[in-house]
Amino acid sequence: MVIRAVVFDIGGVLEITPDLGLDRRWETRLGLPDGEILARMRDIWRGGSIGTITLDDVHEALRDRLGLDHQKVAQYMADLWREYLGTANTEPIEYARRLRPRYHTGIVSNSFVGAREREQAAY
């Protein structure tokens, strides 16, 4: 079989995405017990990862479920994107570049709603 294309994942492969403790910091800030943000937002995180909701839906849920005002939603989302986007993993990115034009290259991801635009801008 002849290999004609190579496909890469983004999170954890082309991006280094360590856990920066986003929810723990915000739970402390909001006076919530550990795990409470996930408990309240689980269906929203799922919907955002499979594309069944919009970024506006995420913002609305953060306001309604966590009691955040517009400014705090913006702060939370800025923290979320910092953690979610991580940093470029330059070694596999350079490897992917070297494969072209001999092979078709592609990226597959279950990126969260709104992430694609930020990933394209960052990388």
Where are the predicted features?
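N-terminal helical cap/lid subdomain that shapes the substrate entry/recognition surface
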Residues: 2-90, 101, 112-117
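Short, intrinsically disordered, charge-balanced linker/junction segments flanking boundaries
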Residues: 119-123
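Short amphipathic alpha-helical segments and helix-helix/interface helices
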Residues: 92-97
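Short beta-strand/turn micro-motifs composed of small residues
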Residues: 109
